């Protein structure tokens, strides 16, 4: 008999994925990383900002343990406020995904290994839906609120 997991337990387990994703975003050059970035009625699990000269590149990552369809829907929505949108899940879950669905949506797929390191299974495509005014507003707010400034 399989033990049922409460939504509180799931959120706690999803939070265990935050630090590895923060480390990954730092590794690709993000100089600001904000967990639980508000976007309308949603909370982007991890939002990364890479400032390079006059251009800012932004990343949104939706963390999920199992519900990949929900993660895909959320990550697709986040393409409005970031340049690159990803989902991140434990490796054993990612191995069973049909990546063509994510590729078609332009959403990338990250996996978290049991040792806490992160790999990229599918690179995100630069969003064609990004609204610069959302990105600029979120970036300005993050200058003051970033919990993981590098």
Predicted segments with their positions:
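Conserved catalytic cores of phosphodiester-cleaving nucleases, focusing on short active-site segments
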Residues: 21, 46-48, 57-67
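Catalytic cores of nucleic-acid endonucleases
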Residues: 65-112
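Non-catalytic C-terminal interaction segments of nucleic acid-processing enzymes
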Residues: 23, 105-150
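Short loop/turn motifs at secondary-structure junctions
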Residues: 56-57, 81
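A generic structural motif
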Residues: 49-51, 112
């Amino acid at each position: 008999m399989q033990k049922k997991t409460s939504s509180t337990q799931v959120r706690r387990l999803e939070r265990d994925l935050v630090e590895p994703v923060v480390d990954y975003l730092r590794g690709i050059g993000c100089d600001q990383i904000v967990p639980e970035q508000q976007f309308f009625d949603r909370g982007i699990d991890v939002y990364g900002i890479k400032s390079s000269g006059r251009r800012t590149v932004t990343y949104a990552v939706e963390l999920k343990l199992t519900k990949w369809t929900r993660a895909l829907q959320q990550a697709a929505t986040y393409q409005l406020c970031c340049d690159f949108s990803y989902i991140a899940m434990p490796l054993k879950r990612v191995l069973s995904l049909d990546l063509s669905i994510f590729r078609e949506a332009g959403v990338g797929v990250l996996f978290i290994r049991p040792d806490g390191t992160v790999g990229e299974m599918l690179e995100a495509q630069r969003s064609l839906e990004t609204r610069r005014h959302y990105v600029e507003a979120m970036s300005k707010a993050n200058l003051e609120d970033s919990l993981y400034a590098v």
